[in-house]
């Protein structure tokens, strides 16, 4: 149990996919202008990332490795992610039409989110078992969601702040992301791998 807790804390805080590995920057910058959209995108990404991580592990363990098709790993994972995203899109459309409208084009773009593919590939490279894959996928998504919600809250405050003209828009957003990355570096000594 301690192993899974360390994996969770280490992935969420110490090795955050956005701030440390720089994966998932497109939705991080694109969806983080409003807090409600960031929360919705975070929930959708959490569902997709966790499910895709587990499905990719199963495809790798039960199909690719036994058949010696390891060279098709990236292509197979992209197909798995596309299927999971389409399933998520159907679920969100049926359960929450408002959230579906808010997410707009960003929901299908989860398919091309490099963080989702990155988690699947890192699961395989780090030789995680089924449970570790599920925890790693969920914790990567939780870290992504945490950072995106924090960033969206900061950006909403910056929208009404008196920011100098040269720093308005993307400039202050990138500076803020850099400062968040520095803040998360404080967690570096928290978990030893």
UniProtKB/Swiss-Prot annotation:
EC number, UniProt record: 7.-.-.-
Annotated localization: Cell inner membrane
Name of the protein described by the UniProt record: Ion-translocating oxidoreductase complex subunit A
Membrane-topology descriptor: Multi-pass membrane protein
Secretion signal, residue range per the UniProt entry: none
Lineage of source species: Bacteria, Pseudomonadati, Pseudomonadota, Gammaproteobacteria, Enterobacterales
Cross-referenced InterPro entries: Ion_transpt_RnfA/RsxA, NqrDE/RnfAE, NqrDE/RnfAE_oxidrdctase
UniProt keyword list: Cell inner membrane, Cell membrane, Electron transport, Membrane, Translocase, Transmembrane, Transmembrane helix, Transport
NCBIfam families in the cross-refs: PRK05151.1, rnfA
Species this protein is from: Yersinia pestis
Recorded family membership: Belongs to the NqrDE/RnfAE family.
């Amino acid at each position: 149990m301690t192993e899974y807790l360390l994996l969770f804390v280490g992935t969420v805080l110490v090795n955050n996919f956005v701030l440390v590995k720089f994966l998932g920057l497109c939705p991080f910058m694109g969806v983080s202008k409003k807090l409600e959209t960031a929360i919705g995108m975070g929930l959708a990404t959490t569902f997709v990332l966790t499910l895709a991580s587990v499905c990719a592990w199963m495809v790798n363990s039960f199909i690719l490795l036994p058949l010696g098709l390891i060279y098709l790993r990236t292509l197979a994972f992209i197909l798995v992610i596309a299927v999971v995203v389409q399933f998520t899109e159907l679920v969100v459309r049926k359960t929450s039409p408002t959230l579906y409208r808010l997410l707009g084009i960003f929901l299908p773009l989860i398919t091309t989110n490099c963080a989702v593919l990155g988690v699947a590939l890192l699961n395989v490279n780090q030789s995680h078992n089924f449970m570790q894959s599920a925890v790693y996928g969920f914790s990567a998504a939780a870290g992504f969601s945490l950072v995106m919600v924090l960033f969206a809250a900061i950006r909403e405050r910056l929208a009404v702040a008196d920011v100098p003209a040269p720093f308005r828009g993307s400039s202050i957003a990138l500076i803020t992301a850099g400062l968040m990355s520095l803040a998360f570096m404080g967690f570096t000594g928290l978990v030893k791998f």
